[in-house]
Every structure is written in C-alpha cells, then in structure tokens.
C-alpha cells in the first residue's frame, strides 16, 4: 500500500496514525520506507508533529534517518529526541558523519555529547576531528575489516562474519602486518573463492592504492574515480592503516565541489540555496557584480571614444550587441571545457598545447561560418557590402580572441595556483566585451570614409 502512495499521502497517513496513537500501524508503514523517505517526511511534516514522530521511531530508524538529513535538521533531531536517545543514535552513526555534525555545535554541547557516548566511539570521533577539514582523515571511517597477513581464508571468513554488521563496507578486506602497516588487499570475491586453509598473504594484491590521511578530499575522489573503487584505504606515516573512505562519502564530496565550482563559475556567491534570505543572497553576490560594473564602464568609455564613427555610420550600432555577445558566449564555452579538464587534473604540458591548438582551429571554423552568415545578413539588410565586410571581419577576429581568452586565462591562473573557476563567466564575458568593441570599432574606423 505504501509503495503507491505519494509523499503528501504518506505524511497525512502518518500524522493520522500519530494522532490516534496506532503504534503498530505506524511501524508497518515505517518498515516499508527507506531512510531517505523517513528524512523527507520529517522535513515536510508540520513542526507540531515532529516530536511525536521521532518518539515513535527506533534508535536504528533515527540513526539511518540522520544520515539523510542536512546539518540543520540533524541538529533539530538530536535536540528533539533527548540526550539518551541522541547518545544511542550517535554511537551507531558513521564516525565521519558524526565528526562533521559535531563541528556545527558549540564546544559545551559537543563535550557533553562526546562524554555521554561509548568511550571507544567517542575516541574514534575525536581522532577524526583532529584532521584538517578537507582531508581524507576527516572523512574516513574506522568501521572496516582488516586481517593479519598470517590468517587463513577460514580465519578471515570468521572475522568477516563477526564484523559484517558494524563495518561500513565489506567489499575489500585490508591486510596488515604486525606493525599495522598496510601490506595488501583482498576482495570479498577472492576470499570466498579461496581454499579454507589457504593463506591470505598468498591471495592478496600487494600493489595497494591508498590515500594519505592528510590528502585533500578532491584528490581522494579522483583516485576512486580513476580506479573505480568502492572504497580506498587511508594510511598515515610509515603506511600504517587508520581507516577507509567509501564511495558514498566521495559522492558527497564530488557534489559539494561541483556546487562550489558552479558558484565560482557564475560568480553568484557561495552557499546560496532556495532558503537563503534575499538580503543575504544580495550581499554575497554584490562584490562580484560591483567589480564587473566598474569594469563594464570601460566598455562605455570605448563606445564614447568612437562616438564620431557611430554618428557617421549609425548602422554600426545595430551589430554592436551581436559582436560583443557572440565573443562572450564562445569564451564561456571554452572556459567550461578547460575548467572541467583542470578539475579532473587531465592537464599536462602536452595536453595543454594540444588543447590550445584545438581551440584555435575550432575558433577559426566557428568564426568563418558565423562571419559569412552575418556578412550575408548585413548586405541584405543594409545594402552595404563594405559594412558587411567590417562586421564579418570583426566577428571573425573577436570569436578567435574570445575562444582563446576562455582557454588560456584559466590555464595561466591554474599555473599560478589560483582557482581558475574564479576567472569565470561574468569576468571573461566582460573582458571579451572590451576586446570585441576595440576590434569592431578599430576596423570600422579604418574604413569609415568608405562606409
């Protein structure tokens, strides 16, 4: 029955069950829902029903649901369920998720919650919180299966069964020596295909791809993407195994980094969502826009400088927006290609040279097609072949310049260790506006007496 219900129907059904105190019917509904569904229902239901909704959920339900909620709602849940239930849920949460959640709390509340947790779990969480914010150590979990290299397949299976319930991932078994150094890795498939008395060290892969605990999360994401891993081991000095990073955490990193790059690319300000207040959104966007406003005044100065040319040939004004707009568009297209390549670290010297020449050839093809089209349009529209030549040649040159600026500027910034996404959309477009107007009016001035 639940499968065919919309979220609105589900919320209404749950509210009725909460009101009537029908715990058994409530459980039958909840048992058919995924953690995401429970989290969505909590966020969307009226505030007055949330406390009772949480009181009817088990600790396991709350633990699973918290993992699907945004930080602000996670804090709401922990505050509403009370200290005892919150502590039980925190003991079962993934340590990396809990470490990130506790960062949002004030020191006093953080210490209270950590002290109320099981000693082993509290120690593990505090260990993660000692790592830098965007490092592999901060996002790793200590809930994984490691096996001594002297184990047999039979011993490994016994340990795997005992740890399967609490381990975040059992796709890979990590093999260590007496010093807890990572010496190999074994897949679950290889384990079950091995003979019971066969040694793990005879089955394991010794070339292990791992991440350093202090390595940036984006670099870890690239490693997992490159090798198609479901998890990657995290090591400290001397290759000592300290945890693993799983692919679900990497997906969160990729989404977050993509959001940040898009915000920079659009110069729209950081952390702006549908719920952001208007004055906050305006405050975050204004610095870029004010900067671009003053840069844009240069375009106005250029037009003012060539005022005499405009007075003599008014038709020049008709094509001015088209020339500057097309230049900005092609620059933004090239910029998107380069930023994507840089974000995936596909750029080496050979690739950069090949990309620049490829974009140059592309701009020539695009410029040739567009300039021929606009020449035909201007001749038919204005009946002036020379005007058509001026517009077409200007467009041809500006499209080449726009494409190359969108290609070369982010590469230069990358080499200077500056985030290339900063030199994005609006800035490239504004700079290309200036260049396109200079070229357009420069060519027009050269032929002004013949026009």
Curated annotation (Swiss-Prot):
Instruction: Decide whether keyword Transport is in the record.
Output: yes
Binding locations of Mg(2+) 3:
218, 257
Q: Where does Mg(2+) 2 bind?
A: 96, 249
Pfam families tied to this protein:
CBS (PF00571), MgtE (PF01769), MgtE_N (PF03448)
Q: How is its activity regulated?
A: Binds cyclic di-AMP (c-di-AMP), which may regulate the transporter activity.
Task: Describe the outcome of a gene knockout.
Answer: Deletion of the gene results in a significant growth defect under rich-medium growth conditions and in strong dependency on supplemental extracellular magnesium.
Q: State where the protein is found.
A: Cell membrane
**Any transmembrane segments, and where?**
286-306, 312-332, 372-392, 393-413, 428-448
**SMART domains assigned:** CBS, MgtE_N
**Binding site residues for Mg(2+) 6:** 433
- The record places the following residue ranges in the Extracellular compartment, namely 307-311, 449-451
The role this protein plays is: Acts as a magnesium transporter. MgtE is the dominant transporter under rich-medium growth conditions, and it may provide the primary route of magnesium import in B.subtilis, while the other putative transport proteins are likely to be utilized for more-specialized growth conditions.
Kindly give the NCBIfam families that the UniProt entry links to this protein.
mgtE (TIGR00400)
- Its name, as the record gives it, is Magnesium transporter MgtE
Which organism was this protein described from? Bacillus subtilis (strain 168)
Q: Taxonomically, what lineage is the organism? A: Bacteria, Bacillati, Bacillota, Bacilli, Bacillales
